[in-house]
Every structure is written in C-alpha cells, then in structure tokens.
Amino acid sequence: MKKILSVCLAGCALCAALAGCDGGETQSGTQIELKTVEEVLEQTPAEDLVGRNDIWQFTTPFYETQIQYNEGFLLREDGQGGTLPVRLMFPAAYVLEVRSNDLKTLYEYGKDYLVEDGQLVIPEGSAIVPVPDSEFFLSDAENAEWIYNANAGEDEGRAVTTDRFVLYPYRYVVTYIRTEQYSGKTAPSKGGQLTHFSQKIADKEGITMLYVGDSIGEGAGVSGEFLNLVEMTRSGIEARSESKVELSNCSVGGIDSLEFMNLINGLYDKINPGILDNAKQKLRLMEQKKGFADIVFIALGANDSAADRSADLFKLHIGFLIDYFREANPDVSIVLASSMEISNKIRKNREDDKRDLRLHDLGEYAKVLAELEQEYTNIALADVHTVQSSVLEKKYLEDVIADNLNHPTNYMSRLYAQTLLKTIF
C-alpha cells in the first residue's frame, strides 16, 4: 500500500461533546468510529473509493465521513520558484486519488503527486501545475479594479484577478482517508425546531422551498459543471426523504438586507439601479410563492459587510424578512444562513474609493441571527460562517473563495449545502 502513511485504530465513540445544540450555537468537534486504512479499503464498495459527482458525497458533512471526498484546493506559486504547500483538513493516511476540479482528469501517484507525513506534495514535473503569479496577479495595476493584500492589508498589495475562470484550471480535488477525529466547529441537527418542514417530510408530502439570498445564492463562484449550493440543497432534501421539492430561487446578485427590505416596501429608488430589474423579477416570484412556502432560507450578509452595516441594523432587516414571510404563511419554517467569510485581503482601487471589501465582521451577523433564532419559533440558524471558520484554520482562504472576492468555490458550495442540510434534518 504505497500511499499509506499511518495506520491507527480509534475506539468507537459515536457521541460528540456538544457546546450548546440549542441557542443557535455550533457543536465543538464530532467523533465517528474510525477504522484502520485496511478496514476502510476492505469494507468500502469500490465505487465509493473514488470521488464522483454524487449528491451523497457532496452533501454529507465532511466531518461525518472517514473518506474525505473531493476536498478542493488551489495550487499557487510561492514567489520563489516553487509552489505553496497544499493544506488539507486532516493528515492524509491514504490518498485514494487526485483529480482536476471537474473530476475529468485523474493524476498519477509518484509522478504527479506524493504523500509525505500526511501531506500532499506536488513534485517537479507534475501535471498538477500552480496558477502562475502572472495570471493570479495583474500587470496593469493602475487600471485594476481590485488590489490584493496578501497580509490582509499590511502591505500595499498588488492588482489581482477576480475572474474565477482564470483560477479554476488550477483548482484540484483530493479524495483521501483520514484516521484522526475532527475538533473544529460543526453544525448540529435542528430539524426538531422546524416543526412545519419536519412534519411535511414525515408525511412524505411535497415541499415548496424558497431561497432568498444574494449572488452566492444565485450560484456565483461555481465553475458550472456541478449543482450550485441551492440546487444541491434541494437535491439533498429529496435524497434524504420521500418528498419532492419545488424550488423558487429568489436570490439577487449584489443585494443586501436593507435593499431587500426596501424592495418589499416598494422603495425602488433606494436600490442599486444595476440590480433593480432582477430584484423586481424576484420580488414577483416571492409574492407568488410566499403563501405556499413550506421552508424559506434567508441567506444574506456578504454585501452588508461590504456596506459596513451594523449588526443591529442587519438584525432589524432580517427580522423584517421573517415577518414578511410569516404574515403570508404563519406555519412556514425559516432557516437563517450566516454568510461565508469574504476576502479580507482585497480592497477597491479607485482614487475616490480605497475601501476594503470586508468592512464589518460577519461573525457579528451570525450572533444576531442566533438571537433571532431564540426570538421566533419554527426557525433555525444554519451557521455556515462559524463552521467555515474552523475550515479556514486548516485551508487557505483562496481554497474556498473562487474569485478573490466573496463567492464560493465548488468545494465551498458543498460545505454550504452540507451545513444547510445538517441543520434541517
């Protein structure tokens, strides 16, 4: 077994130590029964020893499986003639495969990658190549829209690409076996809080699902070969139940919580003209569907951070949206999704605008969403932000942000869907 690095047998411990399953908090760590590498290889069907475009592989929380499927990474140059080390969520006890981001290209062990002390190593001459600095950074700094500060604003920075399609050819996925437990933040199951949704699932009835978000909800950031996070969530509900899901995606790229409130109140002059037509179209869809919705996901915050909106105002606006849907259907279950972290390394590059993209702490928004969870019934917080914070202790920010701005990679979109689905079931 040339790719085995370590073999350990952990005892069976199926109950995680919880840090407040209610009150909107995440769990601290999760423990699963860990088998030896040999046991995993012997007991797992062959088709499950490879990374596939599979709804269960994509939406089962990574911390609940010993095989880490399709963990994504961006390979970058280190500025000194080499490449930055690949960061994995766990030490890799056995690497099953490494593929291109689209899963179409399978790379060869020994030639394209090695495994040393649990780490994935890319040797010289590998077909796994890093994004050249000449493509990651832009030569025309004067006319560039964004400046990237590798040290989160501590240096002058360099002009950087914000085109995800420039970066996707240098994104890869690795499927491997871990033999260590996870100690990071995880999402608790809160299906019991979502009384209407859970009853519909139990009765095997059809589900009407609304998703109210921004460009992340529209699917910005993904490469196009796979379902976006909203579509994955719908498919994940269907895979976990005998219910068919009718999805209405009411997301509006570029919108924030205040603009959604203004949209509903008809204050169109207070909405960015560049998004107004799309916003009006999505409002019509919400008006048509709100009275029939069984579950509504409200997922905002990234653009509020860019607007430097206070947590108190953000809470007020989200509360308005909750009331809007509850007035139409008092029984509707509502999921509040905290926003993924956006880049804290990038700022505007205009003479009249040098602002950072990330101005307000998104963690503060997660806290007020937890307060709303306690103030209403039949509601649950899916705390994507806190779950992702533990991921970022292991991974590069560029592994989860597709375009150096605020949009999720395919890999991060799967983490989003995993958190939403874990929360509602």
PLM ranges: what are they?
Residues 1-4:
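Positively charged n-region of N-terminal signal peptides that target proteins for export
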Residues 18-20:
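C-terminal motif of bacterial Sec signal peptides marking the signal peptidase cleavage site
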Residues 22-24:
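Bacterial signal peptide processing site
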Residues 34-186:
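Extended beta-strand solenoid/passenger and fiber regions
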Residues 180-253, 282-289:
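Serine-esterase "nucleophile elbow" of acetyl-processing enzymes
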Residues 211-212, 218-220, 225-226, 247, ...:
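Oxyanion-hole/transition-state-stabilizing segment in secreted/luminal serine hydrolases
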Residues 329-333:
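A short helix->loop->beta-strand "cap" motif at the edges of active sites that frequently abuts
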Residues 339-425:
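Catalytic His-Asp segment of secreted/periplasmic serine-dependent ester chemistry enzymes
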